[in-house]
Amino acid sequence: MRRIKIFDTTLRDGEQSPGASMSVEEKVEMALMLEDLGVDLIEAGFPVSSPVQFEAVKRVAEAVQRPIVVGLARCVEKDIDAAYEALKDRPKDKRMIHVFIATSPIHRKYKLRMEKEEILERVRKYVTYARQFFDLVEFSAEDASRTEVPFLIEVYRTAIESGATTINVPDTVGYALPDEFGELIRTLKEGVPGIENVDLSVHCHNDLGLAVANSIAAVQNGATQVEVTLNGIGERAGNCALEEFVMALKVRKDRLPYETGIRTELIYPASRLLTHITGLIPARNKPIVGENVFLHESGIHQDGVLKHRETYEIMKPSDIGRSSETLVLGRHSGKHALRKKLESYGIKLDDETFQKVFEKFTELADRKKEVYDDDLFSIVSEVLKEPLNGYRLVHFHVHTGNTLLPTAAVVLQVGNEKKEAAETGNGPVDAIFKAIDKALGLQPKLEEYIIQAVGTGKNAQGEVKLTLKIDGELYSGRGVSTDIVEASAIAYINAINKYLIAKGLLRKNGGVE
């Protein structure tokens, strides 16, 4: 099985996505995650462009051990010098320079104002210059997919003769179709002298939504390296998404006999870290990492998944490091899904009682987009005429400031029982979580925390979704409020209540067993 190198450019091309800029420290944190994920190369930045970019490349090169660290440079002497200065302390076999120049007619005429001969001379001069400092040199012909093929062959021949160890074929504006891009790669593979001695890389943009398809077509026609970003972030519509490309190979290995070094179980944690750093939340229906990917609301789909997951799922959530909660209850849900959801919390009802619960559930589902677990607990409590909601937040107080140690106090109540506690923390949200832990005598581990706005303007609310690990199992919670700390506390208590209910730890008259 042929191995495909994964060249990750999240920290360089991905960061060029509007709103995705990262500090030096954030780039280092992300680079360490990418190393754990198993990427082969990390393009850390464009050293000549600013002191911050230079420092980021240098710091990433110092932080990671296994991957090759790459610095970008134009075919300009000062760019190459800056890349060398940023990477010179890294072992020669673990550092690479990526030099590029545009080659398409529109770029030659309007951007560079150069003739073909001038382009070839620059390639020859600056790839040769780069090889004085780097054993590993990648050369890219920017806008390759819109460049005349005979000229493109000549450009890559010149780059290889001048010492390039990787040639990269960018579909810079996402213009190519899979069949023509695959044909281009095959033509280059057959027509460029010496290409068999170097890596053949592709860098596809997603302007027509074809970045992953084009990358797969390239691999099928001889490419040995694919350039990607996490969550597909990047210029304009983004780049080939690491998670989509890798999982396509994994899921369809019957037709795609290629492997990568990616630890797929770390894909979702890596995606969440990037979201946390940049604030860019993937669309709910984003393949692989979107919130809806493993969720089913249709009753027919839910029934099928409950009987056998592969009826409607081509991969397991655990394959990418996600929890296995898959049922979203709404107006399309049926009895099977509702009963399964209740049983997951230890709530077993006889047929007559369940029918009453189901009728109230369908009434509520017709009025709401989604029925949450708290809604279910309220319905069951109403039908059974006994409390099932667990703890609620009666009162909280947070004391914080830029010169103060954040402190939170909470009052929680279930039935007739109240519990109070106060704690300090690393910020107001952390403080209130610790106060809740202290009040309930629990030590959950926060696995995931997502916050997003609901609505706009001064009346916008914050929605917090989080996941806790308690006794080795995962429990999700949701909270909404105009106050982010309150929304966080509600979500935290919501997740804990699910644990208490599932384990049968809530007494009917209130309190914990």
Swiss-Prot record:
GO biological process, one term: L-leucine biosynthetic process
GO molecular function, one term: manganese ion binding
A single cellular component GO annotation: cytoplasm
Binding site for Mn(2+): D13, H203, H205, N239
InterPro entries referenced in this protein's UniProt entry, alphabetically: 2-IPM_HCS-like, 2-isopropylmalate_synth_dimer, AIPM/Hcit_synth_CS, Aldolase_TIM, LeuA/HCS_post-cat, LeuA_allosteric_dom_sf, LeuA_bact_synth, PYR_CT
Pfam families in UniProt: HCS_D2, HMGL-like, LeuA_dimer
Subcellular location: Cytoplasm
Cofactor: Mn(2+)
Swiss-Prot/TrEMBL keywords: Amino-acid biosynthesis, Branched-chain amino acid biosynthesis, Cytoplasm, Leucine biosynthesis, Manganese, Metal-binding, Transferase
Residue spans crossing the bilayer: none
Reaction catalysis annotation: 3-methyl-2-oxobutanoate + acetyl-CoA + H2O = (2S)-2-isopropylmalate + CoA + H(+)
Renumbered residue ranges of the record's region Regulatory domain: 392-513
Biochemical pathway: Amino-acid biosynthesis; L-leucine biosynthesis; L-leucine from 3-methyl-2-oxobutanoate: step 1/4
Residues covered by the Pyruvate carboxyltransferase domain: 4-268
Enzyme Commission number(s): 2.3.3.13
NCBIfam families, alphabetized: leuA_bact, PRK00915.1-2, PRK00915.1-3
Family: Belongs to the alpha-IPM synthase/homocitrate synthase family. LeuA type 1 subfamily.
Self-association state and partner proteins as the record states: Homodimer.
Protein name per Swiss-Prot or TrEMBL: 2-isopropylmalate synthase
Gene source species: Thermotoga neapolitana (strain ATCC 49049 / DSM 4359 / NBRC 107923 / NS-E)
